[in-house]
């Protein structure tokens, strides 16, 4: 056994967001300073994973709800964009680099998850190609900077899970979600609309295309706020909305359902919604972003 520390580089720095630490810090600070925090700290958040010029201000609404003084472990659940995966995968590295500071993976929790036999390992190549987890690392580092040596991360790449697998993983993660010192970050964009995404749902009663997209997204968002995994699955089957993080969201909803059985009282609220551009013609395209937080009462 070698004791060499293996690092995942910040492979999207310099393209999806700035590679300059001071510049990145100033941008994140700017976005966070424009946002209100709610009264209760978040136990879980849903936030987008696009380039920061598109979604940085939206994501701030979720990260503003994180309380660094109580958070000790951060589970980051992101969808797989590049490799076919029918389960969930764990990283094979020790450290995730960011332009702000390095984040340590929690090898103790990784050991517990690995023992279940429900996970596979992703290669370093897969890890560095994937942006769905990485785009949350600078925001995580920024939100936690006052306690930077006191927390670990648990990155999980979520595959194209069946409903029964979402339930199984939800059950597994529910015991971690029950712990107030854990935070779950669920990585998802919302509707990807236009020819390049092969998705062009349009409800003409809504008027302009972008309004139809917003109506469709907000229908899904209100179902997520009801914390009902079955209704969310049915919504996706009916409208096929291109929500890329639907499986991580499904896992979170199933974990919540599991905790509600034992009487835990939780609520989820979306705090911001945005679109990369406003579609008005069939030639246009856009991606939607939403940020929200789960609180425990």
UniProtKB/Swiss-Prot annotation:
CDD domains assigned to the protein according to its UniProt record, in alphabetical order: MEMO_like
Signal peptide (from-to): none
Record keywords: Phosphoprotein
Oxidoreductase in keyword set: no
Residue positions where Phosphotyrosine is found in the record: 210
GO biological process, one term: regulation of microtubule-based process
DNA damage among keywords: no
Homology family: Belongs to the MEMO1 family.
Its job: May control cell migration by relaying extracellular chemotactic signals to the microtubule cytoskeleton. Mediator of ERBB2 signaling. The MEMO1-RHOA-DIAPH1 signaling pathway plays an important role in ERBB2-dependent stabilization of microtubules at the cell cortex. It controls the localization of APC and CLASP2 to the cell membrane, via the regulation of GSK3B activity. In turn, membrane-bound APC allows the localization of the MACF1 to the cell membrane, which is required for microtubule capture and stabilization.
Subunit structure as annotated in this protein's UniProt entry: Interacts with ERBB2 phosphorylated on 'Tyr-1250'.
Protein name per the record: Protein MEMO1
Organism from which the protein derives: Rattus norvegicus
Gene: Memo1
